Amino acid sequence: MAEQELAMQVLQQVVKLPVVKVERSKFLVDKFSKELDPQDIPTLLEQGPTSLLSQEILDRVANACIRDNVLLASGTSVLAGLPGGLAMAITIPADVTQFYAFSLKLAQELGYIYGYEDLWASREELSEDAQNTLLLYLGVMLGVNGTAALLRAGGITIAKQVMKTIPNKALTKTLWYPILKKVLKIFGVNLTKGGLAKGMGKVIPILGGVLSGGLTFATMKPMGESLQKELSKLVNYSEVQYQEDVETIRKEAEIIEGE
């Protein structure tokens, strides 16, 4: 999938920034240790906050994360203080880097609050599944149809438990592809199944144009709120909800393929 590989180059540059990587265990302990007894911390780390805490608490912490990241994005330079080699490797315009760095940081935090596993299992490199999860986070934040349903049903531990009871409804990669493709279009990349012009130079000006066209730091708050709203549906996620999400994904994939 040449289109996805090209867009991933942008993603891979941004995720190299130290500010982007959220250590799940440290984040969860920092945010929830005051709400729990010490003996509950292992359960928090193993099963996630949704196994121990009310939706009210989860939503409150999530909203605080949205507020904090919006403020950071407005006043912190993610490129300041970077080692020379890493700074030189970032070829994306600074304003684009800034926006996506804090968007991805916020998205990870919201994901961990509502039950997602550690995206950085290999510590240094993101797996393909982890990269797809980040793309879906951004897709939800940008309002791409089908991404919220796919994010919920496509692999989170809660959904995996539900899937065991209805294996015939399991998602296939053929359903993932059209929706991921649509997310990439939202990034401003002109996608074709035949491939794309090679090189980052074709991507960066488009991303810069999207940003200057209104994708500013001020939009991060509603984008974060959109992701929080959809992820919060994972609290008490049921078989009925899973089936509804799968049907939404199937319909959206058919619509996209018919375009």
Give short role names for the model-derived ranges.
Residues 79, 84-95:
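Hydrophobic/aromatic-rich structural module bridging two neighboring secondary-structure elements via a short loop
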Residues 1-79, 101-259:
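Terminal, membrane-proximal amphipathic helices
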